[in-house]
Amino acid sequence: MDDVEVPAFQRARRPEQRELRRQEILDAAELLLADLPAEEISLRELGRQLNVSKTHVVRYFETREGVFLELLNRQRLAWLDALSEELPEPPCEPEQAMAAWAGSLAARQVLCQLWSLLPNVLERNVSAETVLVYKLIDLEHRTRLATLIRDRVPALTEDDALTLTEYAVVSLVGLWPFSCPTPAIAEATADPRLERARVDFPVMYGEILKTTLAGLLARS
């Protein structure tokens, strides 16, 4: 059955209208991701959330993955704004900063889900131009993150601080799915013999950040 188009979501004619429509689509995606895994959300489902057709959504985003990439940028920026307040004030122990970083991310499940899907889902089925725009914004955001960390760990060089953010993203991509087990995996790992198979994301991610930071500091 075709989706019904409604006048409330008319085609944007001016740049500010177009941006408003894009933000409305991102808002809808964010709401859906609070209840559904990303793989269950299609452009058609986004259209239903807004009471418009899939065609309307495609006018503003080329693919579902394009929507998620843009939402990842928006979520990451909001996190960085909050992180500047959530990290301990300098001077502080490096391990405190890493633990706060991990805890702050763990509290933002939609952001973690999107970030973990980056290489295998979000960067597929999009144009080279979309990927270029995303990666330039990602670099800008990680540079800002590196600055926040260097403010608290001044012994870290500028280059190593950016390297830390690169390793942090790769670690999140690998670790987050293990911290969201299916019911069958959760039941199996409830066995006391498999205690070490259970992943507590903020704890393990914090340890990864601390270990990586220690290695970078040791080599500098």
Locations of regions flagged by a protein language model:
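Helix-turn-helix
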Residues: 32, 39-66, 70
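Amphipathic alpha-helical segments used for helix-helix packing
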Residues: 108-132, 180-187
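Basic, helix-initiating cap at the start of DNA-binding domains
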Residues: 1-37, 44, 48
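C-terminal peripheral helix-coil segments that are non-catalytic and often amphipathic
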Residues: 1-9, 143-155, 171-220
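Alpha-helical structural segments
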Residues: 20, 24-31, 35, 49, ...
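Amphipathic alpha-helical packing segments from all-alpha helical-bundle domains
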Residues: 125-153, 159-162, 206
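Hydrophobic alpha-helical connector segments
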Residues: 70, 84-114, 164-168
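Amphipathic alpha-helical interaction segments
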Residues: 24, 45, 96-100, 163-170, ...
